[in-house]
Amino acid sequence: GISETVCDPSGVEQLEVLTVDEPTISMTFQVNDSPFAGVKDRSGGKFLTSRQLRDRLTRETQHNVALKVEDTDDADKFKVSGRGELHLSILIETMRREGYELAVSRPEVIIKEIDGQMMEPIESLVVDLEEQYQGGVMARLGERKALLQNMEPDGKGRVRLDFMIPARGLIGFQTEFRTITAGTGLLFHVFDHYGPKADGAIGQRQNGVLISNGTGPSPAYAQIAMQERGRLFLDPGEEIYEGQIVGIHAKDNDLTVNALRGKQL
C-alpha cells in the first residue's frame, strides 16, 4: 500500500509517510443517455452500463490514489474527484480509448467550510511567455481573480509571471492561454492552499452555443446558412439529434437553430 515500508525484521525502521494531495476538482460521470448511445458508427463504445462504469472507476482508485469516487442519489451517476482538470481529463480519455461510453458534467471546484468560512483551493501559477503577450494574459488572469506575486523579465524578450489564483479560475484557461500566446507560452500550476472563496463568477464562457432543433442528417445547405451565426462543429451530412450543441454562437447567448433545413428544389 501507499507509504508502507518493507524492511528486514531485524532492523524495522519506517520511512516518512507520503502525503497524497487532496482532490480539488470534481465531475459527475454518468451513463451516456444521448440518442446515439451505443450506436457503433457514432461512438464505437463497448461498455455502456452503470455497472461497467462503476467497476472501471473502482479499479482506477486501486492505483490512482489521488482519485476519489462516490455514489450519488442516481444509480447511473458517480461523483469523481481529482487533483485538477488534467488529472480527470486523462482518466476520461483513457476510458474512451478502452471502449467506455460515458457522459461527464462540467468540472467544479471542491469548496470547504473551515472555521465557519467558505474556502476554495488556491493554486500557485507560473507563466513564461513573450513580452508582447504579457498584457493580454495579465488582463485575462485578472478577470479570473488571479493576484500577481512576482515578475521576472529575462532580458531576451520573455518574462516569467507568478500568480496566486483560485482553482476555478484555471478551468478552461489553458486553451485560451495557448490562443493568446500563439502557442509560445508555458504554463505551470500546483495546489498551494485553501483560501477564502472569491466573490462572483469566474471564467464564464464569452460566447453562447448553437443548439439543434431536430434530429436527422444536417445538409451542407443548412450549415452554410448557419455559418453567419458562429463557428460549427459539423461535417456536411452528419447525423445530429435535437438539443445537440452544433457550434459556438458569435454572441453571448445560446441560440436554437434549424440544422436540418434542405434546399427547396
Predicted regions span which residues?
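Accessory interaction regions appended to the cores of large information-processing enzymes
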Residues: 1-265
